[in-house]
């Protein structure tokens, strides 16, 4: 939690104002931030200086794992995080590849589970990684990549956290996640949870011990309309100790995650938090 607040303070103190063309807003921006989460010792990086709705972050990750491309499917899992980008993004609404209401296009999990091949077939990146790790194999290329420039025009949003690289040392599993852009007050709250949970889940379904998850952010920013709340409210609060995250031990396989797993299979204990803060969201 302290490393999150340190990054927020760094942006406030050292950030440079950048005009963001997509949103039409100014962002206070720094380049490069590295966060580390101790999954093996269950140090869950849930923000405590405001109430964090961790279930929505886990639901979104489940949707990515399942390769969902429709905001309605994400809502059914328990998150509305894709409603705006699917239905309120004017550029996407005018895009001929949009199939209709709630369609997200070929983003995130679609690329992870069905990356298009030139011959017309598809590559299931995630299944390959799970199969390898389950056999104790690390070919130094256990990489889940959502970043496909050849299909950006076929989706409502380029991926922000676009790469997850899994590594084995003995029977301990590690994760390096890379994020090109991060709305720190809003998005990082979710992204930290997802990096942690992704490693915890992958370790469980491959029979490995979770180690550390490394989270690199390239462009970390605070939007101008978020700055006052961050500087004058959230950064004035003292963090509480880290809570703990729990996964249903009956989850054993990738197929389990694809079929019957719901938010009821996850729990957080020891979570103390300050009052919620309503940060503006930029579509």
Swiss-Prot record:
Q: Which reaction is the catalytic activity of this chain?
A: dUMP + (6R)-5,10-methylene-5,6,7,8-tetrahydrofolate = 7,8-dihydrofolate + dTMP
Any one Gene Ontology cellular component term annotated for this protein: cytosol
Quick check: keyword Cytoplasm in the entry?
Answer: yes
Q: Which Pfam families match?
A: Thymidylat_synt
* EC number assigned by the record: 2.1.1.45
The entry's dUMP-binding residues are 22, 180-183, 191, 221-223
Q: What UniProt keywords apply to this chain's record, in alphabetical order?
A: Cytoplasm, Methyltransferase, Nucleotide biosynthesis, Transferase
Q: Which GO terms describe its biological process?
A: dTMP biosynthetic process; dTTP biosynthetic process; methylation
Supply the InterPro entries for this chain.
Answer: Thymidate_synth/dCMP_Mease (IPR045097), Thymidate_synth/dCMP_Mease_dom (IPR023451), Thymidate_synth/dCMP_Mease_sf (IPR036926), Thymidylate_synthase (IPR000398), Thymidylate_synthase_AS (IPR020940)
Q: Which pathway does the record list?
A: Pyrimidine metabolism; dTTP biosynthesis
Its chief place of residence is cytoplasm
- Taxonomically, the superkingdom here is Bacteria
MF annotations from Gene Ontology? thymidylate synthase activity
Binding locations of (6R)-5,10-methylene-5,6,7,8-tetrahydrofolate? 183, 282
- Active site (UniProt): 160 (nucleophile)
Subunit composition and interactions: Homodimer.
Q: To which protein family does this belong?
A: Belongs to the thymidylate synthase family. Bacterial-type ThyA subfamily.
PANTHER family registered for this protein in UniProt: THYMIDYLATE SYNTHASE, THYMIDYLATE SYNTHASE 1
NCBIfam families registered for this protein in UniProt: PRK01827.1-4, thym_sym
This chain belongs to which protein, by name? Thymidylate synthase
């Amino acid at each position: 939690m302290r490393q999150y607040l340190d990054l927020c303070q760094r942006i406030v103190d050292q950030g440079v104002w950048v005009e963001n063309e997509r949103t039409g807003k100014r962002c206070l921006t720094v380049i490069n931030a590295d966060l580390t989460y101790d999954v093996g010792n269950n140090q869950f990086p849930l923000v405590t200086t405001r109430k964090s709705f961790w279930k929505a972050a886990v639901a979104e990750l489940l949707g990515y794992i399942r390769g969902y491309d429709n905001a309605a499917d994400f809502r059914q899992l328990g998150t509305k995080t894709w409603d705006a980008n699917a239905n309120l993004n004017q550029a996407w609404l005018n895009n001929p590849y949009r199939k209709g209401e709630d369609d997200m296009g070929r983003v995130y999990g679609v690329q992870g589970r069905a990356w298009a091949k030139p011959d017309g077939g598809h590559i299931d990146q995630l299944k390959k990684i799970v199969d390898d790790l389950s056999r104790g194999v690390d070919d130094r290329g256990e990489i889940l990549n959502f970043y496909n420039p050849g299909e950006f025009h076929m989706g409502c949003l380029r991926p922000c956290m676009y790469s997850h690289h899994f590594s084995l040392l003995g029977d301990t599993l590690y994760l390096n996640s890379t994020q090109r852009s991060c709305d720190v007050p809003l998005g990082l709250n979710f992204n930290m949870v997802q990096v942690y949970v992704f490693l915890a889940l992958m370790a469980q379904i491959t029979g490995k011990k979770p180690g550390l998850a490394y989270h690199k952010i390239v462009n970390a920013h605070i939007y101008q309309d978020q700055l006052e709340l961050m500087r004058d409210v959230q950064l004035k609060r003292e963090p509480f100790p880290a809570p703990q995250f729990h996964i249903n031990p009956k989850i054993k396989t990738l197929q389990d995650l694809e079929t019957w797993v719901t938010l009821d299979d996850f729990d957080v204990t020891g979570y103390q938090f300050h009052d919620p803060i309503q940060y503006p969201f930029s579509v």
